[in-house]
Amino acid sequence: ISLASDKRFSSYFKKFQFISLTNFGTAFGMGLLVMVFMVGQGYFWQPVVGFFGAFCGCVVSTRLMQYFVVKNFPHYAVEDVIGNKQEIAEEEKKVEKSGFIRVLNSLLDGGRTGVDVGLAIIPGVLIISTLVMILTFGPSSTGAYTGAAYEGVALLPRLAEKVNFIFEFLFGFGDPHLIAFPITALGAVGAALGLVPNFISQGWVDGNAIAVFTAIGMCWSGYLSTHTAMLDSLGYRELTPKAILSHTIGGIAAAIVAHLTYMVIMLFIAA
């Protein structure tokens, strides 16, 4: 967002390319955190497979977004983001600032942007993550509610069992509870990562699940919470539905690629 506000940076793009930066940036927004977390759980090459899947999902999402933008606004294919090049020329004529001032400005501007985005995504994070946790996990082992964490009504696993063959075919999920990760990642990938240790302790997770979790966690990165705020800050709020649709498809593609890549690698290892 900070780069997008820079007129000189924006001048390198046509409008349809500039708008798709939202999808491109979201696909890798939490990449380092997701990969480090998975490595910390004892998995090493599986997150790399997930990274490859996220890269493929990013390509799908970004190109789809560009297609939708050009289809609905054909003139965006030829229009520059900065129509008046004189503005850039005037910026270049400004007096050069000292290194200290530039560092200070970058810290202040970056901090303000971070706080703005954080405040914008809090409602989505709280609402989506809370709902998913309530709908994923059941009561305690005694069947009673004790007020402990991860106690809910376990509706999602019951529904997932009905269509588990779809998730098993596309993602290789061996347990219906695992569908909670991608659903939570819609709102906040950090909250989705918090589910993984519990999944591991329950014995539901294997290497394939880690690869798929990494891919879909990186690619989606809580985009339902952030896309609206990002496009609003860029001035294209009306394109939010297109961005969300494109990124939904991109995340699914990332998970499928990660699953297939993992299966191919396992075939070579077995051979």
Regions found by a protein language model. Name each.
Residues 92-189:
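Transmembrane helical segments that form the transport core of multi-pass membrane transport proteins
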Residues 74-97, 122-127, 156-157, 193-196, ...:
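Short, charge-rich amphipathic segments
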Residues 51-113:
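Long, contiguous bundles of hydrophobic transmembrane helices that form the permeation core
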